[in-house]
Amino acid sequence: MTESESAAVPVDAAAFREAMSRLASAVHLITTDGPGGRAGFTASAVCSVSDAPPTLLVCINRASSAYAALTQNGTLCVNTLGEGHETVASLFGGRTPVDERFAAGTWRRLRSGAPALADALVSFDCRIVGRHAVGSHDVLYCAVEAVAASGQADALLYSERRYRTLPRAPRSGSAPAEPARAARAVGARPAEGPALALRSA
């Protein structure tokens, strides 16, 4: 077998998931509300596409319980979580009924009407402007129409199948801070989490 032929052999899905579990990712709640109903899920597959115009990329499994509402509403809010949000992240990442998911937080509405978590580190209110199917998922291109930053907690990360926190950096000009701390694990490994955002509840 030549080197090029060897490279063409598909990577085992389990091996890929294990490799991806070693990447530390921010944790987000993706929420929506509108004609298709209220829904939400926990995701780590979120990133910036452009700042001209401001655009985010969000991935969702087409088997997700939130998929129908999200696509029908055409809007969503990306709520980036911080320390103390482990419970709500786990609720939105499992099979918890929708009403119980939203009962775990305090919500407000931004421009689109999608629920924005009041104490999220930051909430990006978006309109879905493009969609591309890749395997089991849709890649959504989301135009950011409003931003609300209110949370002051350390960032919440998901790595090695558990939640961890990353301390905030000191502001420029502030008093000398303690030596930088490594990201620390938070609580027990959750039964469900954002995983790779390859699977969304």
UniProtKB/Swiss-Prot annotation:
Pfam families linked: Flavin_Reduct (PF01613)
Molecular-function annotations in GO: FMN binding; FMN reductase (NADH) activity; FMN reductase [NAD(P)H] activity; riboflavin reductase (NADPH) activity
GO biological process assignments: nitrogen utilization; uracil catabolic process
Record keywords: Flavoprotein, FMN, NAD, Oxidoreductase
Extent of Low complexity compositional bias: 167-195
Enzyme Commission number(s) from the entry: 1.5.1.42
Catalytic activity, reaction form: FMNH2 + NAD(+) = FMN + NADH + 2 H(+)
InterPro entries the UniProt entry points to: Flavin_Rdtase-like_dom (IPR002563), NADH-dep_flavin_reductase (IPR050268), RutF (IPR019917), Split_barrel_FMN-bd (IPR012349)
Region (Disordered): 167-201
Enzyme class per UniProt: oxidoreductase
Function: Catalyzes the reduction of FMN to FMNH2 which is used to reduce pyrimidine by RutA via the Rut pathway.
UniProt record similarity statement: Belongs to the non-flavoprotein flavin reductase family. RutF subfamily.
Protein's recorded name: FMN reductase (NADH) RutF 1
Species lineage: Bacteria, Pseudomonadati, Pseudomonadota, Alphaproteobacteria, Hyphomicrobiales
